[in-house]
């Protein structure tokens, strides 16, 4: 009989990378640069989001051999992406020992209706969310970590800011209703708007935050971007294309780690932001055709 990881164990792993940076890497050399820079973990994938966006086509789980090579090369946790709803890709990633599976909208969805039942796995999962409803639905499915979706591969933090603000505003509403004793409104919010069990709403009201670690992702390209998301209440950051699509990946990686850890110290952020070289070329969100937006995948 398969042994399933408990929510406590899965969420415990997520807390281990709290206040850290998870960096997208496509090979062993990049993984070693990330580890040397102080990354809390790496996300192993064959193409960073910026390349997926440009090249198009169907984006799938990466070659397990490439993931294993990266696992053998570094001592920090290694994560990998599965398509939304593709539970067999997730089974494969779990079988090769990835530390966390990202059920990711960056890849082409396999199921347009259902997400993976994450409670059926021992490996913990991270999922993206644009608002409190999406976040809590993924947690109800068994996600041990949430991240903003942002708009991956753009180098533009505006969507990540929008999504984090929406989550924060949703939490504030829940807490406000609870403090005013508006139980009927909370029940209606849970049932009709958020579509999650009341137990999750009660947990949010008590904690005044999500019950799992919440990272920023999507469009983070500079140390200041990382610090901005941390000041908004994120527990850490994912950086995809922003490091290895920049002019000086080694220096930028270290700078983003420093800024994430010292997010409330403007002098430190200013110092590490000096002489970073060219940032990745960004994309304005309003220039992206509606059908090319990744964040709308998987609600």
From Swiss-Prot:
Catalytic center residues: 81 (schiff-base intermediate with d-ribose 5-phosphate)
Residues where D-ribose 5-phosphate binds: 24, 153, 219, 240-241
Pfam family for this entry, one: SOR_SNZ
Entry keywords, A to Z: Lyase, Pyridoxal phosphate, Schiff base
Pathway stated in the Swiss-Prot or TrEMBL entry: Cofactor biosynthesis; pyridoxal 5'-phosphate biosynthesis
Lyase recorded as keyword: yes
Superkingdom per UniProt: Archaea
Gene Ontology terms, MF aspect: pyridoxal 5'-phosphate synthase (glutamine hydrolysing) activity
EC numbers on record: 4.3.3.6
The protein's enzyme class: lyase
Cross-referenced InterPro entries: Aldolase_TIM (IPR013785), PdxS/SNZ (IPR001852), PdxS/SNZ_N (IPR033755), RibuloseP-bd_barrel (IPR011060)
The reaction(s) this protein catalyses: aldehydo-D-ribose 5-phosphate + D-glyceraldehyde 3-phosphate + L-glutamine = pyridoxal 5'-phosphate + L-glutamate + phosphate + 3 H2O + H(+)
One Gene Ontology term from the biological process aspect of the record: amino acid metabolic process
Entry function: Catalyzes the formation of pyridoxal 5'-phosphate from ribose 5-phosphate (RBP), glyceraldehyde 3-phosphate (G3P) and ammonia. The ammonia is provided by the PdxT subunit. Can also use ribulose 5-phosphate and dihydroxyacetone phosphate as substrates, resulting from enzyme-catalyzed isomerization of RBP and G3P, respectively.
Cross-referenced HAMAP family: PdxS
Subunit structure: In the presence of PdxT, forms a dodecamer of heterodimers.
Similarity field: Belongs to the PdxS/SNZ family.
Protein name (record): Pyridoxal 5'-phosphate synthase subunit PdxS
Source organism (scientific name): Methanococcus maripaludis (strain C5 / ATCC BAA-1333)
Taxon lineage: Archaea, Methanobacteriati, Methanobacteriota, Methanomada group, Methanococci
